[in-house]
Structures are given as C-alpha cells and as structure tokens.
Amino acid sequence: SPFGIWRPGVPNGISPKALDAYGSLYADARLWLASGWVDYLAPQLYWPIAQRELSFPVLLQWWRQQNDKNHHVFAALNDAAVGAKFSADEIARQIQIVRAQSSNGGEIHYHLRSVLENSALAAAVRAQYARPALVPAATWLDSTPPEKPKLTVAGEKNSIAIRWENGGMEPAQSWVLQVCRSNLWTTEILPAGQTGRTLEISRPDAVALRAVDRSGNLSPPTVLVPKKYSSAPDIKGGTKLMK
C-alpha cells in the first residue's frame, strides 16, 4: 500500500510540492504494478475529493492506467481522518467514485477501528455495502474454476436443512449460498469450514451453492429446485451470480 502519489506533479494537475515517494522513499510502486510484481496495489489516497492538487479521482484513475498486467488496484481510504479532516460522507462518495471508474475494483479501509468507533462512518459504510461481495478473482495465479459442490436438502413443513461438501479434490476457500423466495435471490458468503445451514422461516423456491477457490474463482452452481418447478426461477433482484 504505497503513498498515493508516485512523483510530484504526476499526473498533470497534482501538486509539484507533494512528497516524492520515488525519490525520498525509494518506492517505485508504478514499476511494481506495471510489471505485475504484486497481486494487488492499494495506493494511499488519503485526500478529499475537492482538494484539486491532491485529487482523489485523478490519482485513482492514474494508478489504474499504470496497471498493464490487469492486476487488482484497490483504493486505500483514510477512515482515520473522519471527524478531524472530513466527514463520513466523504468516504461514501469516494466509494462511489471507485465504483464509477471500474466495475472490478474495491477499497481498503484504514483502519477498521475507525469504522467501529465512529457511528456516522459505520452508517455511511454500511449503506454502501448493502449486499455481500466477493474479492475479484486473481486469474493470473489460477483461472481454473473449482468443481461444483455436492448439495443435499432435507425438507420439513416449515424448514429445510442444507448440507454440502467439495465436489472435487481442491478445498473451498469459501461458499456462496443463494436462496430464492418469490423470484428474489439473496446471497450469503460463508466460511470454508461451514458445511450446512438450516432455513427455518419458509421453504424456498430454489437453493444454489457455489465453491470459491483460494484465487477467487467461482465454481458452476449446484441448484436444487422443488418438484413443482422444472428449473430455477429467473433472477429479479438480489444478485447476478446465477446468470
């Protein structure tokens, strides 16, 4: 997670008086990223959007443009400055800028304690992360998806018990469990050690499970549907994973 400015005055419009990470810290993070030497880079973009000479969106876009190997670039956000230098809404707007610039990006928050101890910041972050999301796959490490998991469902009148296991030799890093009720899919990301779940509210229309490997690749879904359906209902919200 290098300093957010590679060299003073780069790119155009950035302050020529900024810290020279290349010359003073001996950190050529641009070379690391362009050469593919790191799996992800999280430049410390710790300035507000409105500060033109240290512009958050301009610097984020510049770092993305150096990403010749198409590895991950995540924006490191300055949560610790909320309350002292800027508001919680600043962090929310920075998250929105990250998403607007790339559909395959993300953020790293510095640091978690700032979020946990600041109710306004916690609410702002929670509003942006309303649904679970997976870390994008590192396909340069491994692009082969895992085998689809084995899934069984035992149902009673008002609940069902779901059990699953790996479908192949490769252990899962996590699981993506999707449940459909009234044509709306909801998604949970579960730890590798969890191999079962009981749904007690009502019997769903369909259940789907995917394995996620250590590089972030998703397996094909294993889908179980009650006899009254010939196939899983179409998605009308909640997630796009089933498409």
Regions found by a protein language model. Name each.
Residues T187-Q194:
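Short beta-strand segments within Ig-like beta-sandwich modules, predominantly Fibronectin type-III
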Residues L199-L218:
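Beta-strand-rich modules
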